[in-house]
């Protein structure tokens, strides 16, 4: 069960990552949930150091909240927040809409989805009339069973527009290139497809893989519906985990639609000899391993489907998703699982009511009709919440036999079994093992009391294993309700093993499956105060019995650690022992590889969480104030700063030498941090320092994750190389595009030139210009202009000389006029005469230059007039 809808803002969203990465999923918070999906992809990839965010897309999966869960006389879990859990019914792979509504297109159109006529993105499909108009996948006939839904998210839509507050929400980061399976009735091919490109692009590859002569008459189907090849997987919202059916109408050997058996509307099977997933006729019924390969979504319109509880080999109850056809009963870990966890052929089993420990609890027992001597007989138990739920499932092929039908007198033994089961301690919910005012189960109290009094100084207590036979004997005594005196036991390791076994066999761990992701996310926080505060909040939110047992147990383990000098069990040793027994993730029986990956990724964090619960007990389980974390940094360089006394106190620089240890009080986002050194406070560049490890849990997590660090480094190097190659390919493609664009531009210019040359108007103008170049008068224009400028300069010089002479004469005349009595001697007369002669020469010369200038101007004017006449033509 997921957290309430508002909790994603507190704990963040569960982000799933593609296979092959460093982790399967991670809890991640966003500062703003109003960002677009594309921006969310950018943030996710940046935080994980992933390259090429444009190559990823997001897919949201979630479960519908059950309308009610009947317990005793009341309804629990009704959904009061319908807005946050609104089903995405307009999408393939989501829940079924009303029969009158179209699927995938958002209501009325058939361009992007499945229409009522039975096509995906098309408007006709006369061949597949056996399918119903609405029952495609995830049809819930039980009102209590949640439906798993999925949808490809639009990059341009806002993140908050999707039901982030729904149950079990997972935002899957998926690559745009997806692996799909295509089946033609004979063979299955794995193909890579870009979910954003039209599926018509895929048909060439299909033709090559299946060696088709032509794809013009080939069609693809999924969910029994024909796919519109002009659209893409993302727009059609197709679940790529399901196979595509390839059919060629012109090929007589092609998969015929008659071979697609809807099995009276109860199930989806292909062919009589096995098809998708290998499900075949009764002849193949014994091939259980082959039959388990049936994807949950490939079973269309089952008789019944929904969540029930099934007992596993360890006698603990697991919630599984069941699908019942007219012959088989399948159970899956989730409605979207690609492989069944198990399968029963109903006609081969005796089905009868099993004894129950609760008055309103009903269980069915499935016993094989044909047993082989010496072989292990597997009896299946399925639990229902009440008789009403059982009646909903009591439909063919499930026929409940009476006690006499199986030849055993259950009436004589049921009471004894009930009494025995009622006293069972191991493998039952922890709240059922306490009585009265005592919140701690007796087995926990007695084992801890024994160890405190007899085994606190035993070397390797809890680390070394006790006798398995002895542990099983004590377990049997507790389960039978016998009086137990552990102090008779001489092997303290057996008693310690008994306590670990009890914790390990709890059907729901002490820290609960529900809060697994929240605890992992809390322990992953680096800041000590924030981490402890969130862990404390989560611990206090546990059920009362869980909290009481956890507090009692962690206080005891802390006492064991104080005897480490004798027992050699330090805190980190004990955290490694108890961590996996306190918290674990649900295991997928059909996905062993994924379980191992999760175990490798989360084990260091689980051990660190147990370490926090033991070492920081006083902060988590008491009211002791959580101290603020001191963040220390070592200076890499000397920082002289600016300490001239003119800056304000807030902007004052912090001066320090190289190698100094600085207390960081604030880490600014602008690259400037605030800190304290030798009693002085101030700012300094963040690039000048290196943070020092400040948390023992951080050191432990770093040490435990050494292998992951190497793997991450290798993966980053591979991703970097891949990115460089992609960038090179991208540049080559861009250069090719640029080359083609330049060639196209050159061709356009040449065509334009040819068109201009052939234009009559342009031709006439070109001829006119050619004739103008041969005209002598026009050819003389530049020369005449040069002559004109030359004459003008000469005229200007003579004019200036004339003005100077004029000024001189005026001055001399005024001098002479002012002194008429002065006599001129011969020499002075000659000088005046000489000046006069020079002046006359200059004036004559100027007159000639002026005349030539006027003539040149006239010539130029005439030439310009002639040129104007030519161009006016």
From Swiss-Prot:
Keywords: Coiled coil, Cytoplasm, GTPase activation, SH3 domain. Residues 428-621 form the Rho-GAP domain. GO terms for biological process: cellular component assembly; small GTPase-mediated signal transduction. Residues 103-112 have a biased composition (Gly residues). Residues 66-91, 113-144 have a biased composition (Low complexity). Residues 301-402 form the PH domain. The keyword Coiled coil applies. Transmembrane segments: none annotated. It is found in: Cytoplasm. Residues 715-761 form a coiled coil. Residues 64-147 are annotated as: Disordered. The keyword Chloroplast does not apply. Residues 628-694 form the SH3 domain. One of its GO terms (cellular component) is plasma membrane. The record marks 463 as: Arginine finger. GO terms for molecular function: GTPase activator activity. Rho GTPase-activating protein involved in the signal transduction pathway. This is Rho GTPase-activating protein gacJJ. It comes from Dictyostelium discoideum. The gene is gacJJ.
């Amino acid at each position: 069960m997921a957290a309430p809808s508002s909790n994603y803002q507190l704990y963040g969203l569960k982000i799933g990552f593609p296979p092959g990465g460093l982790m399967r999923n991670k809890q991640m918070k966003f500062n703003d949930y109003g960002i677009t999906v594309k921006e969310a992809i950018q943030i996710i990839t940046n935080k994980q150091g992933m390259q090429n965010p444009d190559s990823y897309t997001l897919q949201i999966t979630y479960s519908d909240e059950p309308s009610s869960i009947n317990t005793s006389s009341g309804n629990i879990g009704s959904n009061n927040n319908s807005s946050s859990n609104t089903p995405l019914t307009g999408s393939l792979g989501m829940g079924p809409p009303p029969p009158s509504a179209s699927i995938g297109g958002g209501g009325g159109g058939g361009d992007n989805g499945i229409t009522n006529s039975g096509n995906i993105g098309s408007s006709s499909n006369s061949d597949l009339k056996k399918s119903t108009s609405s029952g495609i996948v995830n049809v819930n006939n039980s009102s209590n069973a949640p439906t798993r839904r999925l949808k490809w998210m639009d990059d341009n839509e806002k993140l908050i527009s999707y039901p982030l507050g729904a149950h079990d929400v997972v935002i899957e980061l998926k690559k745009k290139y997806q692996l799909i399976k295509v089946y033609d009735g004979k063979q299955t091919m794995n193909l890579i497809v870009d979910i954003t490109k039209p599926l018509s692009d895929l048909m060439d590859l299909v033709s090559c893989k299946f060696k088709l002569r032509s794809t013009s008459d080939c069609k693809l189907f999924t969910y029994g519906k024909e796919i519109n090849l002009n659209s893409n997987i993302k727009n059609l919202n197709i679940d790529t985990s399901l196979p595509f059916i390839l059919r060629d109408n012109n090929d007589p050997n092609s998969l015929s639609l008659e071979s697609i058996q809807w099995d009276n509307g109860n199930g989806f099977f292909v062919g009589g000899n096995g098809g998708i997933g290998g499900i075949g006729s009764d002849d193949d019924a014994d091939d259980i391993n082959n039959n388990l390969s049936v994807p949950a979504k490939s079973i269309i319109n089952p008789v019944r489907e929904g969540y029930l509880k099934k007992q596993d080999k360890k006698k603990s109850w697991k919630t599984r998703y069941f699908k019942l056809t007219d012959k088989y009963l399948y159970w899956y870990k989730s409605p979207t699982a690609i492989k069944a966890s198990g399968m029963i052929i109903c006609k081969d089993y005796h089905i009868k009511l099993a004894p129950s420990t609760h008055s309103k609890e009903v269980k069915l027992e499935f016993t094989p009709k044909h047993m082989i001597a010496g072989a292990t007989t597997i009896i299946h138990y399925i639990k229902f919440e009440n008789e009403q739920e059982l009646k909903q499932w009591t439909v063919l092929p499930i026929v409940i036999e009476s006690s006499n039908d199986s030849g055993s007198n259950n009436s004589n033994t049921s009471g004894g079994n009930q009494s025995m089961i009622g006293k069972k301690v191991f493998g039952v919910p922890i709240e059922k093992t306490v009585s009265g005012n005592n919140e701690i189960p007796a087995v926990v109290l007695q084992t801890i009391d024994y160890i405190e009094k007899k085994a606190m100084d035993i070397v390797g207590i809890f680390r070394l294993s006790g006798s398995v036979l002895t542990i099983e004997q004590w377990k049997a005594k507790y389960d039978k309700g016998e009086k137990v005196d552990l102090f008779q036991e001489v092997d303290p390791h057996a008693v310690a093993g008994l306590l670990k076994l009890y914790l390990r066999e709890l059907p729901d761990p002490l820290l609960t499956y529900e809060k697994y992701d929240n605890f992992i996310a809390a322990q992953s926080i680096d800041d000590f105060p924030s981490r402890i505060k969130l862990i404390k909040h989560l611990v206090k939110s546990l059920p009362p019995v869980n909290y009481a047992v956890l507090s009692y147990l962690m206080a005891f383990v802390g006492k064991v650690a104080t005897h480490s000098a004798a027992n050699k069990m330090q805190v980190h040793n004990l955290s490694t022992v108890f961590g996996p027994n306190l918290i674990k993730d649900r295991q997928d029986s059909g996905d062993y590889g994924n379980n191992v990956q999760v175990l490798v990724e989360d084990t260091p964090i689980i051990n660190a969480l147990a370490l926090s619960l033991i070492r920081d007990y006083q902060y988590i389980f008491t009211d002791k104030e959580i101290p603020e974390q001191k963040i220390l940094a070592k200076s890499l360089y000397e920082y002289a700063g600016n300490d001239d006394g003119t800056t304000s106190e807030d902007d004052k620089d912090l001066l320090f030498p190289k190698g100094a240890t600085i207390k960081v009080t604030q880490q600014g986002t602008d690259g400037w941090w605030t800190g304290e050194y030798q009693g002085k406070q101030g700012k300094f560049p963040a690039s000048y320092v290196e943070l020092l490890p400040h948390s023992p849990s951080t050191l432990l997590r770093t040490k435990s994750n050494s292998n992951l660090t190497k793997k991450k480094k290798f993966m980053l190097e591979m991703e970097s190389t891949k990115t460089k190659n992609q960038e090179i390919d991208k540049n080559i493609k861009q250069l090719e595009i640029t080359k083609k664009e330049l060639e196209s531009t050159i061709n356009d210019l040449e065509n334009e030139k040819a068109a201009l040359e052939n234009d009559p108007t342009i031709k006439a103008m070109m001829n006119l210009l050619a004739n103008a170049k041969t005209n002598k008068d026009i050819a003389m224009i530049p020369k005449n202009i040069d002559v004109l400028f030359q004459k003008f300069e000469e005229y200007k010089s003579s004019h200036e000389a004339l003005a100077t002479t004029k000024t001189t004469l005026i001055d001399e005349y005024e001098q002479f006029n002012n002194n008429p009595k002065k006599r001129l001697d011969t020499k002075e007369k000659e000088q005046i005469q000489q000046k006069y002669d020079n002046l006359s020469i200059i004036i004559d010369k100027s007159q000639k230059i002026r005349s030539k200038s006027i003539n040149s101007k006239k010539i130029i004017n005439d030439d310009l007039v002639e040129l104007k006449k030519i161009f006016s033509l």
